[in-house]
């Protein structure tokens, strides 16, 4: 764990030899894995021992279909064909991918691609598995399943797994130790300890830990189950209090910024969106949620013309979306896709910001100022490709926000962001909503939704199955409820900040 850009991904790449063999740089000290020195062995010579899944799994795909990709690594290692077939079948079943075996990799959702990448590494039977944000694109149910499977492999087979992760609320219950990569004035240093020891000292922590510290619970809970055992006095204290009411009802009476009517989207004869009707008013923050492959990214892509529409209509501020081009489109809608890196092309952070100011026709320095709000310590001379995934996401967010669009569309906007960066993003999104601008975001980050959304739309297999207030939708969903809701159920609470505010006022 560690803040955005602290070096977590670099640490993983050190372990499998990508640093310095592929990235360059000067390596001092020694790293050995099962007796092999990463200094003396190149990554290909460690491939039978170490498997790695990066932050953007799709970048590592080399074949066309799911089954071919899962088998490819074994082919490279010369695994006999009969053994390959057996391992492929076992892994498809293990990770729930059997129904996707013949799917083209280009048609997978972000979460499906993440599971395929993990499967492709597992079939090679490594002794050490390195995972860089393995649940960032997974829905809560899929994340729980994948992490449970990995934990079982650790306990049953002795597999060693090292995970770099920002969403600690998902992984704390599974880990034996934490390596905290420190930032700021202690940059480059690490602190290693048991989960409770590290969480007790860390400023960044999931809601369950923040609540435990605030209530001085002993022992400090790391899971919802542990917290519920300690929370009865707090539940009694909150029984006669109410969380603040979000302005969803009065917002709905404001003019519409986005209208989607009878929308149908189809890929390779697979219907991704099935006749959805959907509206967004000025000042709304709407979260699109659902399982992996439910159609969230397809819905967002259709609003800006990235996803071809088979039938139906998309209106932006009353205008057909397909008729809007250039500056009129940029000033109206800003879009940050799941793979935000695709939007970066300049040689430095400062150059990206300068180009964005020019393209958006705003005062020079506007984009960099927004970027500094999200990431105060970013280096302006750094090449965008040298940034971490979270830093690149913040750069793209700043570029899009500089144009001050009336509607901001975000696809998984917290991938790679630590808790501090996420809080800064939440502050910006709330500010936009207060100014009457609108936000639509597709995400599996239930804690983000609990903090910022005024409304939640739930998709399943391309259909809208629920549409209501954030409080109503999240507290009624066992799988998608945030940690505070689970701890304090049946009380209707969403966030730690709601609890502290209510207690301070009473």
Where are the regions a protein language model picked out?
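Catalytic Walker B motif of ABC-type/P-loop ATPase nucleotide-binding domains
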Residues: 129-132, 408-411
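H-loop/switch region of ABC-family ATPase nucleotide-binding domains
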Residues: 165-166, 443-444
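A short, surface-exposed alpha-helical micro-motif characterized by mixed small hydrophobic
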Residues: 171-173, 449-451
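Helix-to-loop junction immediately C-terminal to a conserved catalytic motif
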Residues: 16, 304
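Conserved ABC ATPase "signature" region
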Residues: 82-100, 362-380
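Conserved ABC ATPase signature
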Residues: 104-108, 112, 383-387
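ABC ATPase nucleotide-binding domains
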Residues: 199-256, 480-506
């Amino acid at each position: 764990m560690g803040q955005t850009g602290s070096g977590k991904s670099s640490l993983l790449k050190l372990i499998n030899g990508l640093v310095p063999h592929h990235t360059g740089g000067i390596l001092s000290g020694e790293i050995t894995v099962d007796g092999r020195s990463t200094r003396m062995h190149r990554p290909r010579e460690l491939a039978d021992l170490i498997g790695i899944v990066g932050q953007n799994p799709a970048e590592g795909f080399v074949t066309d279909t799911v089954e071919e990709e899962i088998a490819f690594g074994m082919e490279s290692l010369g695994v006999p064909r009969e053994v390959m077939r057996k391992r492929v079948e076992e892994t498809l079943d293990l990770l729930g991918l059997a129904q996707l075996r013949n799917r083209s990799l280009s048609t997978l959702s972000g979460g499906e691609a993440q599971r395929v990448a993990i499967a492709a590494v597992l079939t090679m039977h490594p002794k050490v598995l390195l995972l860089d944000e393995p649940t960032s694109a997974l829905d809560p149910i899929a994340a729980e399943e994948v992490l449970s499977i990995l934990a079982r492999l650790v306990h049953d087979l002795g597999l060693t797994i090292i995970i770099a992760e920002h969403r600690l609320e998902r992984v704390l219950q599974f880990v034996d130790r934490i390596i905290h990569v420190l930032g700021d004035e202690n940059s480059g240093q690490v602190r290693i300890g048991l989960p409770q020891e590290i969480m007790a000292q860390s400023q960044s922590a999931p809601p369950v830990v923040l609540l435990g510290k605030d209530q001085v619970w002993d022992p400090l809970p790391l899971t919802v189950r542990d917290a519920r055992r300690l929370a009865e006095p707090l539940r009694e204290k909150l029984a006669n209090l109410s969380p603040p009411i979000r302005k969803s009802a009065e917002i709905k009476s404001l003019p519409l910024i986005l209208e989607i009517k009878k929308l149908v989207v189809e890929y390779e004869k697979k219907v991704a969106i099935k006749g959805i009707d959907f509206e967004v008013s000025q000042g709304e923050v709407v979260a699109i949620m659902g399982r992996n492959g439910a159609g969230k990214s397809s819905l967002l892509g259709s609003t800006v013309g990235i996803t071809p529409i088979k039938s139906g209509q998309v209106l932006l501020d009353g205008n057909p979306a397909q008729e809007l081009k250039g500056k009129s489109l940029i000033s109206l809608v800003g879009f940050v896709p799941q793979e935000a890196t695709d939007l970066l092309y300049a040689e430095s952070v400062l150059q990206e910001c300068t180009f964005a100011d020019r393209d958006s026709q705003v005062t020079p320095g506007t984009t960099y100022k927004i970027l500094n709000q999200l990431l105060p310590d970013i280096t302006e001379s750094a090449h965008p490709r040298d940034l971490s995934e979270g830093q690149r996401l913040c750069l793209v967010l700043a570029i899009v926000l500089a144009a001050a669009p009336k509607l901001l569309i975000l696809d998984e906007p917290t991938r790679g962001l630590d808790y501090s960066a996420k809080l800064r993003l939440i502050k910006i999104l709330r500010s936009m909503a207060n100014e009457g601008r609108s936000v639509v975001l597709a995400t599996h980050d239930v804690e983000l939704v609990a903090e910022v959304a005024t409304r939640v739309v739930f998709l399943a297999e391309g259909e809208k199955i629920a549409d209501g207030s954030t409080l109503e939708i999240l507290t009624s969903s066992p799988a998608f409820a945030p940690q505070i809701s689970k701890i304090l159920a049946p009380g209707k609470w969403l966030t730690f900040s709601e609890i502290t505010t209510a207690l301070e006022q009473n």
